[in-house]
């Protein structure tokens, strides 16, 4: 993914910063809990195409990471 393109892209819902997830080929907005797919190196920035992240992923926890005592 081109770093210059990444620097220009924002979440279409909140205009917040996006985090690039290379493993899943997605751009993630942790504020809104949306993950936008990247297809053939082109970000698909449509809310209808975005995946909704689960609560742990939205908080930035890795899959299988233990929850703290307050969760």
Curated annotation (Swiss-Prot):
Protein name: UPF0434 protein Csal_1588
Listed transmembrane segments: none
PANTHER family named in the record: PROTEIN PREY, MITOCHONDRIAL (PTHR33505:SF4), ZGC:162634 (PTHR33505)
GO cellular component assignments: cytosol
Stated family: Belongs to the UPF0434 family.
InterPro entries from the UniProt entry: Trm112-like (IPR005651)
């Amino acid at each position: 993914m081109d770093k210059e393109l990444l620097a220009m892209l924002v979440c279409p819902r909140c205009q917040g910063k996006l985090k690039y997830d290379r493993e899943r080929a997605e751009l993630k907005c942790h504020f809104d809990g949306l993950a936008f797919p990247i297809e053939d190196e082109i970000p698909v920035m449509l809310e209808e195409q975005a995946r909704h992240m689960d609560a742990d992923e939205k908080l930035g926890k890795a899959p299988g990471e233990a929850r703290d005592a307050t969760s």
